């Protein structure tokens, strides 16, 4: 299912539980920290491995500059979107000294419910409307669907997310650089809007259908060295550990059984990339990669214990 390979700062993000669609994984890379993105198609993508035949999307996050004129540089931005009542607040700071530098970033995002346009030029006036929705959540139980006061609003489509990045770079003797890269992304429950609007026998089928909090943690030390020899002009050694958590929770209307499936993936990787001295006509690169995935998968069902409309426990 890994049709496209996602890479961040030289570390592959694809792991044992990746599926065909990578959008839910791409959003764990904070766009406000991206310095550039490289998209590789065709035969060039083979250099990333056999699972990159569908192409590669390589994210490069911002790197602090050593010995910059601006020793301390702070930045803050706040965005508001009226269409879905979303807020995104971002703060970052960069420290630059003679032999080392630091870049710190944190983003807090809150996305509200999406709102459709009311003008349907295609003539199907009821297309996409949401007349009913589920008000069920982890703490509240509702036996029946609720009526939507504004059917153009896609109920249960909002979520929250926080992203953190810390990067240190240290200048070592003999033209070497050491970089420590730490990334953390954590979301709230993310509902499956399509599943919560699935009908069976004229009624909504699911009272709950959520992706549990999606968490991605990355720590990656990297060494860069520049021997400047003919067959070993420069090289990179990148080690990384990633911890990824994903889960799915669902329950049907008129049922108390809630099904949960959770996955926790530990990924260790080590790769080396080397280049020879480039000439006008030729360039040559070579390297190696080692990756280990350890998956812990659990699936279980629990019966809800109710006190009126309040969920007070599970059995």
Annotate each language-model stretch with its function.
Residues 155-161, 171, 175-232, 243-265, ...:
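Flexible loop and strand-edge segments within Gram-negative outer membrane beta-barrel domains
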Residues 84-111, 121-189, 215:
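Transmembrane beta-barrel wall of Gram-negative outer-membrane proteins
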Residues 1-7, 23-27, 39, 52-75, ...:
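N-terminal periplasmic accessory domains that precede
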Residues 18, 114-122, 147-148, 178-198, ...:
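Outer-membrane beta-barrel and related beta-rich outer-membrane complex signature
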Residues 212-216, 259-315:
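Outer-membrane beta-barrel transmembrane domain signature of Gram-negative proteins
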Residues 97-100, 173-175, 226-230, 277-281:
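Outer-membrane beta-barrel channels and translocator barrels
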Residues 13-42:
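Short acidic/polar hinge/loop motifs at secondary-structure boundaries
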Residues 76-82, 95, 104-110, 180-184, ...:
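Transmembrane beta-barrel strands of outer-membrane/channel proteins
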């Amino acid at each position: 299912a890994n049709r496209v390979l996602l890479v961040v700062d030289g570390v592959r993000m694809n792991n044992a539980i990746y599926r065909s669609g990578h959008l839910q994984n791409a959003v764990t890379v904070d766009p406000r920290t991206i310095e550039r993105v490289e998209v590789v198609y065709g035969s060039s993508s083979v250099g990333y491995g056999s699972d990159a035949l569908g192409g590669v999307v390589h994210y490069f996050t911002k790197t602090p500059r050593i010995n910059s004129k601006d020793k301390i540089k702070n930045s803050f931005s706040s965005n508001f979107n009226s269409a879905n009542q979303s807020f995104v607040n971002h703060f970052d700071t960069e420290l630059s000294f003679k032999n080392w530098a630091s870049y710190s970033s944190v983003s807090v995002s809150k996305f509200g419910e999406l709102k459709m346009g009311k003008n349907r030029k295609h003539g199907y006036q009821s297309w996409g409307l949401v007349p009913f929705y589920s008000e069920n959540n982890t703490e509240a139980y509702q036996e029946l669907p609720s009526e939507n006061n504004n059917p153009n609003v896609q109920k249960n489509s909002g979520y929250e997310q926080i992203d953190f990045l810390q990067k240190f770079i240290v200048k070592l003797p003999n033209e070497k650089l050491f970089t420590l890269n730490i990334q953390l992304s954590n979301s709230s429950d993310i509902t499956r809007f399509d599943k919560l609007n699935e009908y069976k026998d004229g009624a909504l089928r699911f009272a709950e259908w959520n992706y549990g909090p999606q968490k991605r943690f990355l720590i990656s030390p990297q060494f860069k060295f520049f021997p400047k020899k003919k067959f070993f002009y420069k090289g990179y050694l990148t080690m990384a550990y990633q911890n990824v958590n994903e889960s799915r929770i669902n329950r049907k209307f008129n049922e108390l059984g809630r099904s949960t499936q959770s996955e926790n993936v530990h990924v260790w990787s080590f790769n080396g990339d080397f280049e020879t001295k480039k000439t006008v006509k030729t360039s040559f690169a070579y390297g190696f990669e080692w990756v280990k995935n350890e998956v812990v998968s659990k699936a279980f069902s629990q019966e809800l214990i109710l006190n009126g409309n309040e969920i007070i426990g599970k059995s």
